[in-house]
């Protein structure tokens, strides 16, 4: 329907398996066994787009308990989970991304890592960026593990910024639905085009499928 939130994976034309799950961080995506299903199904030559960051801040062992340690290094820490009383080793955000990348490469598939999509949030007329946090850590993880990296936050963020904050949020707002994070179909198409733009700037063979 018209008001349904749409993700960028909803608007591809090539055969795509969309395994995204709302509300998951890199850590909880792994903990829930969702990544294992992808790993075991991977075939040589598959392309795997990996994006996290929207749900990776916040509480580590209380509340939603889905955050990771900040950064892209090998840091880890043991936490006692409030809900279960069990203990869990939590790693850095970048550690989880590097694991996903290495798993994909182990299967002969091609990892493509994306910084997360921009939110409809402005500060003094400038759209919010993630260049000093999750976007930075995503880039670092991709470079460290040898994956293709697309700075989707910058590419789509630049497009939204160019629409002009001074026009008001009405124009930019049409790319989002009921909140500042989830995009409309129009926003999903914009982000998909941004991925295509980013792919064209790489030597990733997936770009050969683009029109």
Sequence positions of predicted segments:
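N-terminal hydrophobic targeting/anchoring segments and the immediately downstream early-domain regions
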Residues: 10-15, 44
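Catalytic nucleophile-elbow at a beta strand-turn-alpha helix junction centered on a G-D-S/GDSL motif
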Residues: 5-6, 25-26, 55-57
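Alpha-helical cap/lid subdomain in secreted, periplasmic
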Residues: 37-182, 189, 193-211
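Single conserved hydrophobic/aromatic residue that forms the stacking wall/gate
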Residues: 1-12
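N-terminal post-signal-peptidase region of extra-cytosolic proteins
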Residues: 25-37
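Short glycine/serine/threonine-biased micro-segments
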Residues: 7, 18-21, 51, 185
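A short beta-strand-loop structural module common to alpha/beta enzyme folds
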Residues: 13-25
